[in-house]
UniProtKB/Swiss-Prot annotation:
Matching InterPro entries: P-loop_NTPase (IPR027417), RapZ-like (IPR005337), RapZ-like_N (IPR053930), RapZ_C (IPR053931)
Pfam families: PapZ_C (PF22740), RapZ-like_N (PF03668)
Positions with a binding annotation for GTP: 76-79
Keyword vocabulary terms for this entry: ATP-binding, GTP-binding, Nucleotide-binding
Taxonomic lineage of the native organism: Bacteria, Pseudomonadati, Myxococcota, Polyangia, Polyangiales
Entry keyword annotation includes Nucleotide-binding: yes
Record has 4Fe-4S as a keyword: no
Signal peptide (residue range): none
Alphabetized GO MF terms: ATP binding; GTP binding
Disulfide bonds, paired cysteine numbers: none
HAMAP family per record: RapZ_like
Function: Displays ATPase and GTPase activities.
Stretches the record annotates as Disordered: 310-353
Protein name: Nucleotide-binding protein sce5766
Length: 353
């Protein structure tokens, strides 16, 4: 049985019994180190950027003492005395650990273009201006990093890679065993246009062309989570056609958004008050797409619990009991969903149109 000192000296085993993994991300400035670190974070790595080489071993040991077995470290020429301490620092953490050095590079032309687009100076540019000074910085950085490049476990040329491509490559090459590739999280939000559109929506669909149950006796105080409202809306051929066509569009788009590295997708479906038509169609589309795409989908009915003209909170009662995915927060008109409306404020004027 090893004591705490042995554990620190020989590293910490992961949940599967494998040695802890430390990925050191380095390379040319502008080659994509930040993107690579973000990809590691998506894989569950604890990442620290711009770490001085003298703190590499203490940082790794501190993480392991807290039970962290996947660690990402970003090191570049902006760190003082980089070359002097890099070799010793990396050697100090190799024992008992799976240490990977990821070196990122790109063509001089590509690096210059990226710095020009971001309007940021190269970290080694100490004087002069324009492309000549920038190129001098790139060439000097290549020279300084030559010895570390020779020690790299993985070398990636990002010249022809977009940020999404680089993220995908890093995940493919460095994903630990038993760790799933991060999947895009999709959220469907039903809402009422009279209260404003969801500010975080990527896609919006307007279903106010359908007949409104608000004007049907016995349906006004119900919501789209109640079966009578659902039956009323879905007996309309236009509603079924909308579901079919929108499902085809989203089943085409969603996997492609996910493959491009998009982490979140918010789809808004709106009617006038957000209590009837949008709720029914949001439920129908999300259920179908969840089965077809296999992507995680959550549902929020933002305005389903707003107060109707009668003063009775719509949807409150037997029809709402246990309704899945219902957000019962009462938001102020024009406010974001994170700003709850006081429960005592039930003033809503005017009926639906």
């Amino acid at each position: 049985m090893s004591n705490g000192g042995d554990q620190q000296q020989h590293g910490l085993l992961g949940p599967d019994g494998a040695p802890g993994r430390v990925v050191v991300v380095t390379g040319l400035s502008g080659a994509g180190k930040s993107t690579a670190l973000h990809a590691l974070e998506d894989l569950g790595f604890f990442c620290v950027d711009n770490l001085p080489t003298s703190l590499v071993q203490p940082a790794v040991e501190a993480c392991e003492s807290g039970g962290i077995t996947r660690i990402g470290l970003g090191i570049d020429v902006r760190v003082g005395s980089f070359l002097a301490g890099a070799t010793a620092a990396l050697d100090s953490i190799r024992t008992g650990r799976d240490v990977v050095i990821l070196f990122l590079d790109a063509s001089d032309e590509t690096l210059l273009r990226r710095f020009s687009e971001t309007r940021r100076p190269h970290p080694l540019t100490t004087g002069g201006s324009g492309a000549i000074a920038m190129l001098d910085g790139v060439l000097l950085e290549r020279e300084r990093l030559a010895s570390l490049r020779a020690r790299a476990t993985i070398e990636l040329d990002t010249t022809r890679l977009s940020t999404h491509d680089l993220r995908r490559v890093v995940i493919e090459r460095l994903r630990p065993a038993r760790v799933e590739v991060p999947r895009m999280s999709t959220r469907f939000v039903s809402f009422g246009y009279k209260y404003g559109i969801p500010l975080d929506a990527d896609l919006l669909f307007d279903v106010r062309f359908l007949d409104n149950p608000y004007f049907v006796h016995g349906l006004r105080e119900l919501t789209g989570n109640d079966e009578p409202v659902r039956e009323y809306i879905l007996k309309n051929p236009d509603a079924l056609e909308f579901i079919c066509r929108t499902e085809q569009l989203l089943s085409f788009c969603m996997p492609r958004y996910a493959s491009e590295g998009k982490s979140y997708l918010t789809v808004g479906i709106g009617c006038t008050g957000g209590r009837h038509r949008s709720v029914v169609l949001t439920n129908a589309l999300s259920d179908s797409l969840r089965r077809k795409t296999g992507l995680p989908i959550t549902v929020v009915h933002r305005d389903v619990a707003r107060v109707s003209t009668s003063g009775v909170p719509s949807g409150v009662g037997e029809g709402m009991a246990g309704a899945p995915g219902v957000d019962l927060r009462l938001a102020q008109p024009g406010a974001t969903p994170s700003e709850p409306r006081p429960a005592s404020d039930t003033s809503v004027t005017g009926g639906e149109r």
